[in-house]
Curated annotation (Swiss-Prot):
Binding site for ATP: 90-98, 122
The family this protein is said to belong to: Belongs to the protein kinase superfamily. Ser/Thr protein kinase family.
Function: May be involved in plant defense signaling.
Lipidation (S-palmitoyl cysteine): 4
Phosphotyrosine: residues carrying this PTM: 167, 263
Gene that produces this protein: PBL18
E.C. no: 2.7.11.1
Organism listed in the record: Arabidopsis thaliana
Active-site residue numbers: 215 (proton acceptor)
Subcellular location: Cell membrane
Any one cellular-component term (Gene Ontology): plasma membrane
Record's protein name: Probable serine/threonine-protein kinase PBL18
GO biological processes: defense response
Length: 387
């Protein structure tokens, strides 16, 4: 797993769950109804749940009838991480630290460094920002929802005040680091479309399972060795509306710059809130800019506000494209991706597409990117696209 940083802060402060962005938190009006959240209880060192919705996820994923998680002891995880040594740490944040460790592939018992399976061990501070409820929520969802584009939760440890989670290790780290870290190798167009498609596939699966992710952002998108994206950090996930309800009203918690404007204003949460966040990340993939950039001035500090005028005119799309691409991308594909982002960022939630529709369009884009030969790579120059 890549950088694994988390905290909760008010608007204006920088924060990150697996990287760096600002967390927003606001309680709903007292008259608002809070949706119920089923969280796991404990029995004989394993997890049980009192109820779970009847879900019909896609065939690509799997809904387990009960979690299949390993209950680690604290001493086992101390051994696996070499006593949580500083040189084993791969991430740090307000929640605590993440360490690289090794366990047996079948036994899941601690093994020597370099042998067995590499894992990421997330160790929470007792006074950290990620509370017990968020910790349980993550176990609840990742313990039951299995999909190629969700980070796999292998197990947990709960001993007294000690709370740890054990995940599969993601060798390429977070998308945020690849896009924004100084000195990072530029991501080619084909890889960016692969990341967008695989992240959309994970989010689409969640929505089909009636789960609202609520924290879709570049730092929560982790990458495997082949740059397949997997969604991580499910502490803010929420069960979607059921029956004739159109939304869930809840405390406003999310990340500044990624959270949908109507959710921030009203606390009304729908799957279209996630769609907006996806549009922001897609815009980050296209532009190579973070959603909030304090190094910029004026409208350029907010990626969405700056980019929207260029997204609506295909002749100006090149103006928002990441210069690190060196112009090596298909103009038609860039315009198509920009159009997807524009639709996702619609201020009217009902006019945003479903993630299933986004996924279908991105699949076509990713397929065309795979087939793209060098003759289709064009260098975009301002003179050739002036209106």
């Amino acid at each position: 797993m890549g950088n694994c940083l988390d905290s909760s802060a008010r608007v204006g402060n920088r924060e990150s769950t697996f990287g760096g962005s600002s967390r927003i938190s606001r309680k709903p009006n007292q008259s608002s109804r809070l949706s119920s959240l089923t969280i796991p209880s404990y029995s004989n060192n394993s997890f049980t749940t009192s109820s779970w919705s009847n879900l019909t996820p896609r065939s690509e994923g799997e809904l387990l009838p009960s979690p299949t998680l390993k209950a680690f002891t604290f001493n086992e995880l101390k051994t696996a991480t070499r006593n949580f040594k500083p040189n084993s740490m791969i991430g740090e944040g307000g929640f605590g630290c993440v360490y690289k460790g090794w366990i047996g592939e079948r036994s899941l018992s601690p093994s020597k460094p370099g042998s067995g399976m590499v894992v990421a061990v997330k160790k929470l501070k007792s006074e950290g920002f990620q509370g017990h409820k968020e910790w349980l929520t993550e176990v609840h969802y990742l313990g039951r929802l299995h999909h190629m584009n969700l980070v796999k939760l292998i197990g947990y440890c709960l001993e007294g005040e000690k709370r740890l989670l054990v995940y599969e290790y993601m060798p390429k780290g977070s998308l945020e680091n690849h896009l924004f870290r100084r000195g990072a190798e530029p991501i080619p167009w084909k890889t960016r479309m692969k990341v967008a498609f695989s992240a959309a596939r994970g989010l689409s699966f969640l929505h089909e399972a009636k789960v609202i992710y609520r924290d879709f952002k570049a730092s929560n998108i982790l990458l495997d060795v082949d740059f397949n994206a997997k969604l991580s950090d499910f502490g803010l996930a929420k069960a979607g509306p059921t029956g004739d309800r159109t939304h869930v009203t809840t405390q406003v918690i999310g990340t500044q710059g990624y959270a949908a404007p109507e959710y921030i204003a009203t606390g009304r949460l729908t799957s279209k809130s996630d769609v907006y966040s996806f549009g922001v990340v897609l815009l980050e993939l296209l532009s190579g800019r973070p959603t909030l950039d304090k190094s910029k001035v004026g409208v350029e500090r907010n990626l969405v506000d700056w980019a929207i005028p260029y997204l609506v005119d295909r002749r100006k799309v090149f103006r928002i494209m990441d210069t690190k691409l060196g112009g090596q991308y298909p103009h038609k594909g860039a315009c198509a991706a920009a159009n997807i982002a524009l639709r996702c960022l619609n201020t009217e939630p009902k006019l945003r597409p479903d993630m299933a529709d986004v996924l279908s369009t991105l699949q076509q884009l990713e397929t065309s990117s795979k087939k793209m030969g060098s003759t289709q790579n064009i260098v975009m120059s301002p003179s050739s696209h002036m209106s």
